[in-house]
Amino acid sequence: MSGIEKAWAAGDAGAFAALHAPMATYLAFDGTLMVGRREIESGHAPLFRGIMRGSRLLSWDRRVRLVSSDVAVATQMGGIVMRWQGDRATPSAKRVSANTTVLVRDGDRWLVTAFQNTRYRPWADTLLGRLMTRSSG
C-alpha cells in the first residue's frame, strides 16, 4: 500500500495504475467508477497534472484481514493534503474518507483489485444527527 502513496506523491498516474490488477475497479468518492488500469491511469493523469499536483495521500487506522493466502481486504481512513496546505500533518475534515481496498497476490507482490472510497461524515455531526440526539430541556 505504500507504493500507492509514493506513486500519488510523484504524480505518476502510470505507476499508480500499475499497482492495480489489470481489470481492477476503482470507485471514487464522487461515485465515478473506473474499470481497468487504462481507466484508472486516464482518470488520475489530469488530476495529477492539475488540482492534485503536489498533493499527498495519507492513510491511517488501517486494518488488514487475509481472506485467503492470496486475497486481503484492507480498510482505512485516508485523505489528501493539497499542495497549498504545506506540511500539514492531516487532511482537512472535508477531505477525509473511509476506504476499502481488496488486494490479490500476484507472485511476490500485491495488487489492488477493488477500491472504494466514501467521504467520512459521522452521522452525529450532520444536522439530522444533531437534531435527533439533542436533549430536550
Locate each region found by the language model.
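A beta-strand edge to alpha-helix "cap/lid" segment located at domain peripheries
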Residues: 2-14, 18, 25-137
